Structure formats: structure tokens, C-alpha cells
Amino acid sequence: MYSGAGPVLASPAPTTSPIPGYAFKPPPRPDFGTTGRTIKLQANFFEMDIPKIDIYHYELDIKPEKCPRRVNREIVEHMVQHFKTQIFGDRKPVFDGRKNLYTAMPLPIGRDKVELEVTLPGEGKDRIFKVSIKWVSCVSLQALHDALSGRLPSVPFETIQALDVVMRHLPSMRYTPVGRSFFTASEGCSNPLGGGREVWFGFHQSVRPSLWKMMLNIDVSATAFYKAQPVIEFVCEVLDFKSIEEQQKPLTDSQRVKFTKEIKGLKVEITHCGQMKRKYRVCNVTRRPASHQTFPLQQESGQTVECTVAQYFKDRHKLVLRYPHLPCLQVGQEQKHTYLPLEVCNIVAGQRCIKKLTDNQTSTMIRATARSAPDRQEEISKLMRSASFNTDPYVREFGIMVKDEMTDVTGRVLQPPSILYGGRNKAIATPVQGVWDMRNKQFHTGIEIKVWAIACFAPQRQCTEVHLKSFTEQLRKISRDAGMPIQGQPCFCKYAQGADSVEPMFRHLKNTYAGLQLVVVILPGKTPVYAEVKRVGDTVLGMATQCVQMKNVQRTTPQTLSNLCLKINVKLGGVNNILLPQGRPPVFQQPVIFLGADVTHPPAGDGKKPSIAAVVGSMDAHPNRYCATVRVQQHRQEIIQDLAAMVRELLIQFYKSTRFKPTRIIFYRDGVSEGQFQQVLHHELLAIREACIKLEKEYQPGITFIVVQKRHHTRLFCTDKNERVGKSGNIPAGTTVDTKITHPTEFDFYLCSHAGIQGTSRPSHYHVLWDDNRFSSDELQILTYQLCHTYVRCTRSVSIPAPAYYAHLVAFRARYHLVDKEHDSAEGSHTSGQSNGRDHQALAKAVQVHQDTLRTMYFA
């Protein structure tokens, strides 16, 4: 089962568990990869020339605290001007907007703390701030040079931070900073997304250490902002009114709830006090309209009377409200009862939208932002020219120069693996540009389907019996060709309505039809029925379900039916195809388990829902079949809390499936940012070791821990136009880079394993944080690329290895399992899985998959 020719890997060198507090060190790069044909590329990295000087780091303390960064920057700007003669002279300090200030020459304050008073001219009255400055340290750029050339073991974090602040100082004052990007409203043309939101374009910028050089990573970026507009217009967009005139009555409860959800937390400015445009943050929307909403008003006599908002505006501001039937915004602190009519408020410009975009907004966003690779390359070059870092006075102050041209990189295009099918002819497919097809091929192991049912939740007048009959015939034909014969008609084919009928119907099916293998469920577009089908099928009754959209039943195509068969065969225990055993890397010579792990977090702006951790493990030698484990954990917790128990479950399952104990564990971990590497590695590597030792004291398989990152801004472009692939002109599938733009000393590489269809391909970044198995670069890169070809849902290579992708699917499916029928409205909750006050135990039970589903790939 685990045989195969090829060189034997260095046997794993398990290290004993370190003492707590010991920091694991990622392994050094073993070598550089050599396999594959070379390809000339350009990367959106720009070489920086850094002098070997010291930078002086000071800590600022601004009182009163909690000012936005923008205000802090203004304070520092005023401070530098005001105290030019006494302290700053001709120096141009740079500031991160919080506490850190850097200068190229020391300030004449020695090591003492200096207290200064700074006045900011404000609207109405000036504001006075107290600022203290204290020396922190000397940041040596010489040390950075030593680290980049490998003379120092690790890159000093404080130098990267200092350089980043230098490079960001001017853009932060010119544009709206968001994370590591800068945005600005599009001049003259807006890009509306609907619902009061619009697209802003900008650029991402970060300083990155690489082999021998510091690099500046520059990319185009886009995000959603709220449109600066009157709140009256915002209401119309959110509630789909053509104009406010068509709303002559007060808002209904559901309209008010929807509006509140959108406007809560946003800043508005008032328009009824002339030049005094005070800004407030919205904390709520009143239930009552302005004509009825009262508040306690203190009169001159000292008496307090209840007064309506409409009356107050008429008496105090001589303003008769045009829309007294609309509610008010409650602003500031909830207990203070400050109410503003909608019509005197505007949405403040430059507020980023952190709430989840709707499906329509997301697709509009993608259409607005997708750029072919050559277009993106040109846009980045344009950005570099307009940023002109070499004339930026702050960058020059520190003696930094940035090259204008993108960095030339030599990449390699890896050979795709051969894919083996089954049936009589055991056909072999060879992917071309990451794609192959199943025509004239049969599944490696096809499942025979004897007892199956259809439940149609689409209305009968739209999805008729004729449609169902034709769909059934076509599906049976395609499935027979694919080697997954569906014998006979469905044992049950009925129409149903609404999520409430799912469980009774499924119970009836399970009790009535012995040996029922599959329920095909037809859905009318987006509906809460989907979540309920998966909850009941996966967690309550343990039944295999396959949902199909009504439009794909009304009009069948061989492609959609074939895709359905890929999913059905796997859910029922079949194997679609395998990697050709002779072509697999040597790691397969001994029993090996591939684990994929991911944590998904609830959408921003949602403080209650739990995060969901999922870990999947391979269950055969191909590797094709996987088993899943899933847990709910603390909101926004990135480390997988219960990893030891999850890995233990998967190792037991692997042993039951194969009768082998894996001698190696290859762990692909998705969703970790660089800042969390150390923390995640420390906790999770120990957890995997603990899982092994709990099974057997002496059991110490070699562990390789690889972080997979998709959310980065590295983009690669073909230097030679003839190498470009497809309409979007992307790099070919299999393109790998492990030199020049990668880490100076650690083991990392970029691999673009998929064929880009829309926009510019994003290569995945792999960073090896631990490696007992002593992989060479070639071995790990080939293995990773091959695993990207084992994803069962399609006949193409995907952008990350199948185990990491499956972990993502499992966590995403668990969100549906958490949808609480009793409390969740279908609107907006379809994947949000609200936890509505359910305790941890109830949530944990909700994601627990049924015993019969546990060993299947229900998530496929």
C-alpha cells in the first residue's frame, strides 16, 4: 500500500517536547528548488537601498488619550512646527499615529521625559493636548544588513517596524489609511455597490525582508466605504426606496431593524447649525418617529418637561421637520438620550465598511476590481511613479532610496502529476494549465446507487414534474458514463415547502426506505432550507444530501451534472481519481497522514458568534478520502484550542481505515498571519505531539508544520508575453518561486497551483514553521503541488492543497449547522449561524456531526 520507488527520505528526527516558554525556531531553508522549467517573472517588490545608520526611537504619550490616529498625526505635526527652535530644528520625525516617533538624528532632550503642550485649532474652540516624549532606543540598520546577509540568525522586528513607519508617514497624511493600505475616494466617478456603500481604490504598501535586500511590496487595493450622503438618501438605498417621498408612513419594525443594523456605529455630521458641523456616532435608531419621540428638556425655570424631537427642532432651531414620521438617530452614549432627526444628518466621508457585503455587493465589487495581470502590472508601475518615494522628504531624511522597477525573479514551472481513473480502461489524465476532463473516463471507485430520493423545495409551477423527470434521466445517463450507476427511478419524489418541513420529511424517508443512500434536494435560489437540510442531514439523522439549484434542473448541462456526480460519489464513499502512484514523491513510501486546519471567524461587527476550528485528516494512501473534526471556540480566537483531541481522533480514524500508524504528519495550517506564527506554532505543535503521546507513550511521528497564506499582496507577472496564459494573461499553473522575494533565512516559497480565470492570479505562500521530516525544497514543493490536484469537487488544480481547502469547507458547513431555526431570520443569517445566547455546550452539540456522517466526506 505504501510502496513505490524513489530515494528514501531522511528518517524523521522527533525532538522531545521543549520546556514551556521555549520559543520554537522555524527551520532554515534546506536548499533552493531546482525541478521544473525556468520562467522569467517580475514581482511587485521594489528594491530598497538602506543606509547603515542608527534611527532614534521615542515614545509619545498624548493626553487626553483615545484620539483617532488622524488627530494624533495633526497634534504631532503642530508640535514639530511649534517647538521647531527648542527641540526639532530641521529634523523631519516620522510617527505611526499611536505612540512611536522616529528621527534620523537624536533630539536634544537626552534620556529624560519632556512634557509639551500642543494647541489644535478646532471648530468653535481650540483643543489643548499634553504630549510627553521619552527616548526608547537606538534602532540599528546595520543589524538589519547583517540579518539579510545571514550573519544574524533572525531579522530584528524593530528595524522593520521603524522602516515601515518612515515609508508610511507621508501617505498616512495624504490618504485614508486602512490596515496596510491607503485609500482615496475616486475623483469624479463613483463606484456604487448599493446599500449606501461604494468602492474606493487605493494601494497596499509594506516593507519586507528578503534575500540580501529589503523590499517594498506595492499592490493595488480596493475596499468598501460608506458613501458620504444625507442620511435620508442612505435610508432609501438600504431599504430600496426610489425616493423618500414613497414612504409616507412610519417605518415598519422589520424596516427599522434593517436600517439600524446598517447605520449603527457609523459617524454622522449635523447640518442644522451652520458652520458647526459636529460629528456624532450612531448608537441606535428610535422605535418612535420624531413626532412622538420625547426626551426630558430642562426649561429656564429649572423645571423638566417631556418634549418631542419635532417640537424641539421647531422651537429651538426654527426648523419644521419634513419627515416627522421617520425615526430619529440616537447618538453618543445610550444613557444620554441625544436624538437627531434623520433629515439633519449626513454620513461622514471616509468610513470603511467592516460589515459583511451582501452577495450582490460582493459580485459588483469583484467586477469593479478584477484586472488582467498585464493591466494590474501597469497600474502598480503607475502607482510607483505617482508615489515617487525618492522625492518624499521623510524617506530622504532617513537616506532611503527605492528602485522604480519591479524586481526580476526566476521562477520554475513544476510538472503536473498524472491523474489515474478507474473502470475497464483505467485512463490517465494529464492536466494542461491546471485543467483536465473526465470525458471517456470512469471514477477510480464508483458507488452503485440503488435507493435514492428527490425532495423538491422549488414551487411546482416553476419546477414541473416534466423538469424533474428529464433531470433524473440526464443525471442517470451522466452518472452511468462516469462509473457511478444510479439504478432505477427515485424511490420517493415529492414537493415540499419551507425549512420546517425538512426534518419530518427526512425522518419519514429514513424510517420508510431501508438502505436509502442519498436525498437530492432541489432549492429555489437562496433559501433557509439549505441550512436546515444540512443541519438535519449531517447532524441529526446522518443522511447524505445533495442540493441542486432549480435553474440547473430546469436546464441541465453535462458540465453541471458531471460536477454533481463528482460530489455525490465522494459523499457516498467513492473515490473519483487518484494521483498516479509511480509519480508520487518519496514521502509516500511510509504511512503518512495529511492534516489540514483552518479557523473561520464570524463577520466583523459581530461580537457574539463563536469562531469555528476545523481539522481534516487523510484516511488512505492515495491520499483521497478525508475525515473531519470540528469545534466551536471563543470568538475570534485564532489558535485551535482543542487541537490535541481533534488530531487524536483523526489518528485513531486513520489507524482504523488503514491499519497503519502514520510515521509522518504533514500539517497544512490555513489562516495564520505572520504576527501569529510564533504563538500558533508553539501551542499547536505541542498539541499535535500531545495527541501522539496520549495514544502511545513512545509514538513520535515526524511532524512538518506548514502555514498556507492566501491573504497577501505578492503578485507575479510573466516577463515574456508569450508565457502569459488565458484571457487574463496570468502566470502558468505550477509556477514556483523560492528566491529573491522570499525570507532571507527561513524555509518559505510561493506556488501558484491553479490556472487564473478572472483577474490576476494570487500565488499561495507556504512558510514551513517546523520540519522533523527534513524535506528538501523540491520534495515539499512537488508534494504541495500534487495535493492541489486531489480536490474532489472539480477536475482542476486548486489554489491551496486539498486538506487545507477541506478544513475551510468543514468550518463553513459548521456555520450552517449553527443556524438556529427558532431565532434566526433567514435574512442575513444564512451563514452567520447566530448563537443567540446559546451556551458553549449547546453550540458544541450543534456542530457535532452524526455518527453515520462522521466517516464520510459530507462536506464535499
Swiss-Prot record:
Reactions catalysed according to its record: Endonucleolytic cleavage to 5'-phosphomonoester
Q: Name one GO cellular component term.
A: glutamatergic synapse
Residues covered by region (Interaction with guide RNA): 312-317, 525-567, 710-711, 754-762, 791-813
Outline the extent of the PAZ domain.
230-349
Compartments, as annotated in UniProt:
Cytoplasm, P-body; Nucleus
Where does the UniProt entry say this protein principally localizes? cytoplasm
Annotated segments matching region Interaction with GW182 family members: 588-591, 651-661
Positions where 3'-nitrotyrosine occurs in the chain: Y2
Q: Which residues carry this modification: Phosphoserine?
A: S388, S825, S829, S832, S835
Its job? Required for RNA-mediated gene silencing (RNAi) by the RNA-induced silencing complex (RISC). The 'minimal RISC' appears to include AGO2 bound to a short guide RNA such as a microRNA (miRNA) or short interfering RNA (siRNA). These guide RNAs direct RISC to complementary mRNAs that are targets for RISC-mediated gene silencing. The precise mechanism of gene silencing depends on the degree of complementarity between the miRNA or siRNA and its target. Binding of RISC to a perfectly complementary mRNA generally results in silencing due to endonucleolytic cleavage of the mRNA specifically by AGO2.
- Which HAMAP family does its entry note? AGO2 (MF_03031)
The free-text domain note is:
The Piwi domain may perform RNA cleavage by a mechanism similar to that of RNase H. However, while RNase H utilizes a triad of Asp-Asp-Glu (DDE) for metal ion coordination, this protein appears to utilize a triad of Asp-Asp-His (DDH).
Name under which the protein is recorded? Protein argonaute-2
Which species does this protein come from?
A: Rattus norvegicus (Rat)
> What is the name of the gene encoding this protein?
Ago2
